[in-house]
Amino acid sequence: MLLAVPSKGRLQEPTLKLLEAVGIKPLASDERALVLPTSWPDVNLIKARPEDIPYLVESGRVWAGVTGHDYVLESGSNVVEALDLEFGRGRLVVAVPKSSGIKSVEELPPGARVATKFVNIAYNYFAELGKRVRVVKVTGSVEVLPQLGIADAILDVMATGTTLEVHGLTPIATVLETSARLVVHPEYTSHELTKKLVTFIKGYFAAQGKKMIFLNVPAARLEAVLSVLPAMEAPSVTKLAKGDIYEVFSVVSEDVLPDLVMKLKNAGAKDIVVTSIEKLIS
């Protein structure tokens, strides 16, 4: 099955890193190749522009893909946003030159030219406001167009605001919040491969900021140790074959580790081992 990934842009690198983290690794390195086999035998990657991915998934020829929420809305495609992947966050904003003195969308003059590649979103947004503007379709960078006198405002994604600042622009309205999403064709939402991918991605996210801690505890100190040891549900406790010693392990938040280790040690724990967790699947 084909899984579409961005061929360029700010979503490309984090998408590939996420897939590698869940075990989907390309088995070919030719940058010219558009379809790549992966370490999951039943999954091939297809590289595509992020704005095209919703259409590819809607067609049914591509089972799923990673693209931005903004591109999904712009396309109007019938796809399911199965997961928010928590990267590529930004705001789709209306921005104007600082020198214009305009502070809100309501202050835009009638017929103002708004440059954007999100044409459908722009039409819908301004129509809902009852604002008459002229939407100028642009496929490349839009930030320079007000300087050239080609547009009075732009509608584009803002991540940090630095690019707008460099071009003398300031945001005056937020149209929507966006981030990377795993999108799936409606007929494949209950497919075992989809469930597998969603489970592994959720497991990867759940493991972030978590550590596995192992420790040995004399029987006489077990109650004291368990009283200070946090756990997702309850710590696992196993009696060792020799001696009156118990092995205890638990999943804990990384940020509590420095204080926790000292508390456990003072309570009587020994042989404390802390390890990373790749995935946490519940």
Curated annotation (Swiss-Prot):
HAMAP family: HisG_Long
InterPro entries in the record: ATP-PRT_HisG_long (IPR020621), ATP_PRibTrfase_cat (IPR013820), ATP_PRibTrfase_CS (IPR018198), ATP_PRibTrfase_HisG (IPR001348), HisG_C (IPR013115), N-reg_PII-like_a/b (IPR011322), N-reg_PII/ATP_PRibTrfase_C (IPR015867)
Entry cofactors: Mg(2+)
Gene Ontology CC terms, in alphabetical order: cytoplasm
Record-linked CDD domains: PBP2_HisGL4
The organism of origin for this protein: Pyrobaculum neutrophilum (strain DSM 2338 / JCM 9278 / NBRC 100436 / V24Sta)
Keywords, in A-Z order: Amino-acid biosynthesis, ATP-binding, Cytoplasm, Glycosyltransferase, Histidine biosynthesis, Magnesium, Metal-binding, Nucleotide-binding, Transferase
GO biological process: L-histidine biosynthetic process
Gene: hisG
Catalytic activity: 1-(5-phospho-beta-D-ribosyl)-ATP + diphosphate = 5-phospho-alpha-D-ribose 1-diphosphate + ATP
Described purpose of this protein according to its UniProt entry: Catalyzes the condensation of ATP and 5-phosphoribose 1-diphosphate to form N'-(5'-phosphoribosyl)-ATP (PR-ATP). Has a crucial role in the pathway because the rate of histidine biosynthesis seems to be controlled primarily by regulation of HisG enzymatic activity.
Ribonucleoprotein listed as a keyword: no
Record EC number: 2.4.2.17
Subcellular location: Cytoplasm
Pfam family, one: HisG_C
Protein's pathway: Amino-acid biosynthesis; L-histidine biosynthesis; L-histidine from 5-phospho-alpha-D-ribose 1-diphosphate: step 1/9
Record's protein name: ATP phosphoribosyltransferase
GO molecular function: ATP binding; ATP phosphoribosyltransferase activity; magnesium ion binding
PANTHER family, alphabetized: ATP PHOSPHORIBOSYLTRANSFERASE, ATP PHOSPHORIBOSYLTRANSFERASE ATP-PRTASE
Spans through the membrane: none
